[in-house]
């Protein structure tokens, strides 16, 4: 039993190492240009060793994407569970989302580009968007309970804010504004979300 446990741990460690290196290579060359040979060479194993853990390049890429989704979800859940006021929580949520997204190249490109060769991407997008709406909704409900927000339709408001954040992902992480101060940019956007553009 002890040996089985050790073997299981070694197998998990090998799988995690392959995932780590595959993330780097996929992010550098993209899904279409990356081959299993590229990854096997980087891991310093034969291609047949990769098949012990993953059935195909698509299977490995799916595992990479799910790992990055897991990283993002974990970071956002930490923000959601913090004991901070709703406005600060919304700010931290947007900031964490964009800052983490900058480091998740594979998930970012999978969301932005139509990777038709990988059928699971659409399912990931839908679940990811649903999770985002759910988390934003939690912040909004908390804000109304604490008498800081006035919202009449939580679902519609959450969809609107989620869509606004999604629109910022590309320009603030990789586009024209990719090098600007993220905190300052988020503060400007949050001011518009919370107070609108009307002169007061």
Segments and roles (model prediction):
Residues 1-13:
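N-terminal intrinsically disordered/low-complexity leader segments
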Residues 1-2, 99, 134-146, 163-164, ...:
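C-terminal peripheral helix-coil segments that are non-catalytic and often amphipathic
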Residues 11, 19, 61, 65, ...:
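Amphipathic, non-transmembrane alpha-helical scaffold segments
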Residues 14, 57, 68-72, 93-97, ...:
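Hydrophobic/aromatic residues within well-ordered alpha-helical segments
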Residues 17, 21, 25-59, 63:
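Helix-turn-helix
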Residues 63, 67, 74-103, 157-161:
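Hydrophobic alpha-helical connector segments
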Residues 87-91, 126-129, 144-162, 180-184:
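All-alpha amphipathic helical-bundle segments outside canonical DNA-binding/catalytic cores
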Residues 98-138, 145-146:
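Short secondary-structure transition hinges
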